[in-house]
Amino acid sequence: MTIAARNRFIRMGALVSLSLVIAASAGVAYMTLKGAHPTGQPGPRGFALLDGFFLTPFSPTAAVLAAGIFPFFSLLCLAYVLFAFEKTQTIEITFFAAAAFSVSLESLRVLVPLGELVPMARISPVFISRAILFCRIFSTLSLLASVIFTTGQTAQQLGASVFLIGFFSFSLVTAVPFNAARLYSNFLVRPGFTATITVFLSVIALLAVISYLIQGKTRAAGDYTAAGFALLAFFAGYAILSYCDSWAFLCAGGFLLFSGGWQYLDRIHRYYLWQ
């Protein structure tokens, strides 16, 4: 994939993310103006112990806002990539841009409560949950690939690699069963084999972080090591916002997601600036 082709795809992704920002903002604003934010808990919480903790009371508004944060994060990341890496061919940034774009699909969660007010926006929660599981698998695998392929993958094969990751993620998601009757407090239907999927994503995320730390030590590059820790913050923020149903989760997850993404891009930019 040439730099020009990569930049075209990133611009398209940025436009889609901008569209999702506008759509999610409009949905949240509509519910706010109508005074129709969800008032009840749509289902059990991801962590039942949170019900008894005074810092994490259930807030449906926080759950809706958490979903709306993701496309804004994606748009900022893609804009940074276009500005700082417009003429730089970097394997890491190509995969990170793909991951950042896929994260914007988390905003589809807004359609679940919005669908109760606007019939045209009503989409099956199972379909939305399946699409979001796809973006979580795809983004995690892309970030692992961003460090693995730097050891030998050529820039011309990046397009095919991203496609294969997308195909694998789609195939995996279609094989996972969903029970439409199990809507949780974050407006998602929990998939079957939840524990297995959680362990799988956690292991892939940790492998990505560890791989960056190893590469940083091997190359004697402090910026690469810092990028690994930034990814750890990104994954932590992503996980927290994925289960977000309280204001404490919204604040903590948002801070980790944005600070991790910013630090990762900044450190990779510094690394290539001195090459």
Language-model features: locations:
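Hydrophobic transmembrane alpha-helical segments in integral membrane proteins
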Residues: 6-18, 27-30, 48-71
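The cytoplasmic-loop to transmembrane-helix boundary for the fourth helix
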Residues: 11-19, 147-176
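Alpha-helical transmembrane segments of polytopic membrane proteins
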Residues: 13-15, 62-71, 127-140, 190-205, ...
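Hydrophobic alpha-helical transmembrane segments of multi-pass membrane proteins
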Residues: 45-46, 69-80, 94-116, 169-174, ...
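Internal transmembrane alpha-helix with an interfacial aromatic "cap," most often the third helix
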Residues: 72-96, 104-161
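Alpha-helical transmembrane segments in multipass membrane proteins, preferentially the mid-helix core
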Residues: 75-80, 140-151, 172-182, 194-222, ...
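Membrane-interfacial loop-to-transmembrane alpha-helix junctions, especially the N-terminal start
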Residues: 87-102, 155-166, 216-229, 248, ...
